[in-house]
């Protein structure tokens, strides 16, 4: 990772206390990709990181499990624009439900939490649902105790997840790729959750409705790449970081705005999400003047 006299992002990512209070930096316009699986790029990782740095795409790199997070930590050392975060995806929950003390160690060192959540739709094995719920509550309780934001997968578990956020007073939550009921969407909005709009906004009228419903101050963008486009289009397309530009343009069209306005709005919202975050001091220096 490039080192700089004014910013030591790696120290913050490792949970170390590093800050230079009252030191202003020039605010730089950035795209925000608030949910990505960078460890899945394989041989295309160098190209992906090149796009992230060249196009100034701040990237929240979400983990699926412990090996995923360890790989993301290494990737995060290569770019100050990558935030590695630890989580256990609901598909992996059954593998980790009896290993909570081990997970606690990684939660402690991760500056934010994700990907976590419930998947009671695409995961057909209902015997895994109790493990999903136990893992999720463990992470949300820890996020509340440690004051960390969470990045949530909510498919068919939207109301349960909202109830846990309320129970543990976790106010800084990113709801990733929301596609659930509109009434629960409104409840989550009322609670103050942020929502990422991703590549499906280019193809789905329902997602367009969601993109148009989320209030300005809670809007974020994502790609969920490299696999989201492949999953949506049922082809072999590998989604690269630059796809976030198409997402921004599509969101702008839906909201009758401009790409520049949406980019600025999303950056401001992400800055608000991390404002006063004790774990992300250096990131605030990077992102705001």
Regions found by a protein language model. Give the residues of each.
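Mid-domain alpha/beta scaffold segments of enzyme catalytic cores
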Residues: 2-289
């Amino acid at each position: 990772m490039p080192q700089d006299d004014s910013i030591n992002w790696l120290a913050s990512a490792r949970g170390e206390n590093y800050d230079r209070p009252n030191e202003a930096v020039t605010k730089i316009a950035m795209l925000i990709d608030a949910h990505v699986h960078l460890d899945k790029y394989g041989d295309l990782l160098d190209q992906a990181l090149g796009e992230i740095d060249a196009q100034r795409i701040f990237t929240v790199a979400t983990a699926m499990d412990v090996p995923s997070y360890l790989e993301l930590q290494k990737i995060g050392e290569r770019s100050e624009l990558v935030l590695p975060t630890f989580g256990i995806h609901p598909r992996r929950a059954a593998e980790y439900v009896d290993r909570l003390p081990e997970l606690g160690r990684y939660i402690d060192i991760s500056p934010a939490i994700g990907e976590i959540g419930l998947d009671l739709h695409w995961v057909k094995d209902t015997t895994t649902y109790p493990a999903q719920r136990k893992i999720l509550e463990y992470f949300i309780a820890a996020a509340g105790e440690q004051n960390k934001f969470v990045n949530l997968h909510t498919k068919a578990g939207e109301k349960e997840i909202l109830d846990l956020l309320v129970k543990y007073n976790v106010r800084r939550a990113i709801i990733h790729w929301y596609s659930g009921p509109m009434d629960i969407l409104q409840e989550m909005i009322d609670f103050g959750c942020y929502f990422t709009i991703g590549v499906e906004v280019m193809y789905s009228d329902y997602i367009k409705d969601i993109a148009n419903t989320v209030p300005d101050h809670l809007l974020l963008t994502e790609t969920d790449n490299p696999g989201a486009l492949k999953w949506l289009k049922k082809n072999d397309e590998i989604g690269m970081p630059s796809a976030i530009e198409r997402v921004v343009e599509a969101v702008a069209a839906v909201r009758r705005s401009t790409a520049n306005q949406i980019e600025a709005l999303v950056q401001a919202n992400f800055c608000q999400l991390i404002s006063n975050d004790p774990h992300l001091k250096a990131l605030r220096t990077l992102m705001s003047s």
